[in-house]
From Swiss-Prot:
It comes from Guizotia abyssinica. One of its GO terms (cellular component) is large ribosomal subunit. Its main location: plastid. This is Large ribosomal subunit protein uL22c. Disulfide bonds: none annotated. The lineage of its organism: Eukaryota, Viridiplantae, Streptophyta, Embryophyta, Tracheophyta. The keyword rRNA-binding applies. It comes from the Eukaryota.
Length: 154
């Protein structure tokens, strides 16, 4: 079994004042893409969620070049997730002395980038397991109408 170098870096943004549903709409577009392609997509999309995600992707790439010394052309977004954060509750004053509750949602965004040039070691145990696996399995065919099935039983 070969030990693999750590090839992943991450950037985490917490308490971003935005709905998690709106941030997921942008995150789904960039998951699995390269770093340069992601920056182009985020600059051209017209959503408010693009700017904090752009900053996180840029920060993750800076972490990769600082910590591992990797080139930005080799980076790929391997995992991107949006989690629901705390909800800030405020009051909106209305007519006749009434007030309504306003909920301001927040979200936590995690961007994990992987350097594909450092992925040169392969785990030998996983290769032997997949080769030993049986290739074809025979499935028995049961026809429920020919043997009566459960229709004739009470």
């Amino acid at each position: 079994m070969l030990n693999k170098r750590t090839t992943e870096v991450y950037a985490l943004g917490q308490h971003i004042s935005m709905s998690a549903h709106k941030a997921r709409r942008v995150i789904d577009q960039i998951r699995g893409r390269s770093y340069e392609e992601t920056l182009i997509i985020l600059e051209l999309m017209p959503y408010r969620a693009c700017y904090p995600i752009f900053k996180l992707v840029y920060s993750a790439a800076a972490n990769a070049s600082s910590n591992m010394g990797s080139n930005e052309a080799n980076l790929v977004i391997s995992k991107a997730e949006v989690n629901k954060g705390t909800i800030m509750k405020r009051l909106k004053h209305r007519a006749r002395g009434r007030s309504f509750a306003i909920q301001k949602p927040t979200c936590h965004i995690t961007i994990v980038m992987k350097d594909i040039s450092l992925d040169e070691y392969i785990d030998t145990d996983s290769i032997t397991w997949s080769q030993n696996k049986k290739k074809d399995t025979t499935m028995p065919y049961y026809d429920m109408y020919s043997n009566g099935g459960t229709w004739d039983k009470k």
